[in-house]
Amino acid sequence: MNSAAPAGMSRLQKIALIVGRLALAYLFFTQLWWKAPPRFGCPEGFAFTTGAFDGGRLRLQRTSGLCDWLGVESVWAQQPRPVLVSNLDNAGQPEIAVDIGFLARLNGVFIDGLVKPNIQWFGYVVWGMEAFIFVSLFLGLLGRLGGLVAMAQSAQLMIGLAGIGNPYEFEWTYHSMLVLSVLMFAFAPGRYLGLDAWLRPRLAMAVEKGSRLAGLLRSLT
C-alpha cells in the first residue's frame, strides 16, 4: 500500500478529507464528558432508564449518563425500527423504509446480557473507544484504525437509536456518522497533515526487515 496520495487527488480533496477527519474527531470529543469515568454519568447504584408502552405511547423513567442511553436502547430494542424512511406523498405511512428490528433486538440482547450487568467495567470500554477515536483522528495517528473503530461505534449507535420516537433521535444524524466513519477508513486521512505521514515510511523500513507487526500497523495508517 503506497503512502502517496491516490492518483488524481487534488489539494481541495485533501483539505476536504482533513476537515472531515477533524470534524468527526471533535464530534467524539464532545461526547466524552457527559459519560466520563468512573461513574459514566450514571446515578447512584448505576440505575438504568426503564420504560413501558401505555396506550401506544412510550413512558420512560429516565436516569442519567451512559445508564440513561443504554436503558433507552434496551427499551426500544423490542419495537419495530424502520430506518431510511421516505414518505413520497407526505400522507399516511412512509412508502420506503428498511426495518432493522432484528438488528435492534440483537443489540438489546447484547446490552441487557453483557453491557448492563457489567457497566462498572464495560463503561470504560465504551469511553475508551470514543477517546481513542478522538485521539486517532485528531492527530492522524493510525487513522484507518480510528475510522474502523468509529464505524463500529457509529453502527451500534445507529442500530440502537436512529429514528426512535421518545426521545426523538433524527435518524440521519447516525447515518451521517456512519458514512463519515466509512470514508475515514477508506481514505486513510492521517496521511495528510497527520502523524501517519511521518510514521508510514518508518514502518515501511521495518517491513522490509521482516517485521510483521510493522506490516499490520502500516495497514492501519
Which residues fall in each region the model found?
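Extended, low-polarity transmembrane helix blocks
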Residues: 1-132, 139-221
